[in-house]
């Protein structure tokens, strides 16, 4: 069993500010960093640091070679990562004094994934393997359809949400991982926890995890025995940068599922990993290793 992440890789330009810039305003920044990022890259790093056997597929520009190096350094298999002509995907991130972030995303190389690359990559995977997806790459509906035909277990984190996701067949997914806003967007509901009822009625075989910020998270897992519902509290942390919180949670959660861990244990480990990540600046660089997560949990 392997995990394939067909995901984005970005260069993150991170600006520390007192508050988010307003329309028509020019704002001085306190500092600037250039860091590796992208939801796909972050989740692959989180999966690897959680102890998973993960492969990353996608595209990088000529200026993105250091992103491949970072994945390799973290034990991620990059055999399915392609270098293309053109600009690397990147983000412009404002981080305010409360640790909250505001992000502009330029797709670049992440929007250059071809059907030929998809076919070639998926040919190496099959039943029992996991596929992790986010909404920062092109051809997402095609990837889902082809992976489903190969019997893969598909996890989608539909972020950032846009209308293109309406072309994705959610009935072919094993898990949908969303925050409060995305839960409402995917279901059309006004309340995050009501979203489960709507999604379950449409896609009876779909399991859903909803992260609820400071209120923790809740998972609805559809199994052969019925429905398993688990709620997990959020661990307290002195946040300085929340950029990688969701991606860290996703990586540790999926890594736990792939290992066959109980659902409540997967959520507990993911919640602690996420709490640790927000105490550090940056995205991929803030993600803890499983040994640190387990040590912190043992202290509780």
Question: Can you describe what each PLM-predicted range is?
Answer:
Residues 1-9, 69-83, 93-231, 292:
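Ribokinase/PfkB-type carbohydrate-kinase core domain
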Residues 2-3, 23-90, 291, 295-300:
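Substrate-binding N-lobe of the ribokinase-like
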Residues 48, 148, 258:
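Gly/Ala-rich phosphate-binding loop of Rossmann-like dinucleotide-binding domains
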Residues 1-23:
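Positively charged, low-complexity intrinsically disordered leader regions
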Residues 3, 163, 192-300:
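Conserved phosphate-binding/catalytic region of the ribokinase-like
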Residues 12, 184, 284:
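Nucleotide phosphate-binding site architecture
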Residues 9, 39, 248:
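Active-site metal-binding loops of divalent metal-dependent hydrolases
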């Amino acid at each position: 069993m392997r995990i394939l992440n067909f995901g984005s890789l970005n260069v993150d330009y991170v600006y520390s500010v007192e508050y988010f810039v307003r329309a028509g305003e020019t704002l001085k920044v306190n500092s600037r960093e250039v860091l590796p990022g992208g939801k796909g890259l972050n989740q692959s790093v989180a999966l690897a640091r959680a102890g998973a056997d993960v492969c990353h597929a996608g595209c990088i520009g000529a200026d993105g070679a250091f992103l491949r190096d970072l994945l390799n350094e973290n034990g991620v298999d990059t055999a399915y990562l392609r270098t293309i002509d053109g600009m690397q995907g990147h983000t412009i991130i404002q981080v305010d004094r409360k640790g909250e972030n505001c992000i502009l995303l330029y797709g670049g190389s992440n929007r250059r994934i071809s059907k030929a690359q998809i076919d070639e990559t998926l040919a190496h995977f099959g039943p029992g393997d996991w596929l992790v997806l986010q909404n920062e790459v092109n051809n997402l509906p095609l990837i889902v359809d082809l992976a489903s035909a190969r019997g893969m277990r598909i996890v989608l984190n539909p972020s950032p949400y846009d209308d293109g996701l309406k072309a994705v067949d959610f009935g072919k997914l094993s898990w949908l991982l969303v925050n409060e806003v995305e839960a409402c967007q995917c279901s059309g509901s006004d309340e995050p926890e009501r979203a489960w009822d709507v999604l379950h009625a449409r896609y009876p075989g779909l399991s859903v995890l909803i992260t609820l910020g400071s209120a923790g998270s809740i998972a609805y897992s559809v199994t052969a025995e019925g429905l398993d519902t688990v709620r997990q509290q959020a661990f307290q942390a002195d946040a300085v940068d929340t950029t990688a919180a969701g991606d860290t949670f996703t990586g540790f959660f999926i890594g736990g599922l792939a290992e066959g861990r109980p659902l409540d244990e997967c959520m507990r480990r993911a919640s602690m990993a996420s709490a640790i990540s927000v105490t550090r600046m940056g995205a991929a660089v803030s993600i803890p290793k499983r040994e640190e997560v387990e040590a912190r949990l043992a202290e509780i």
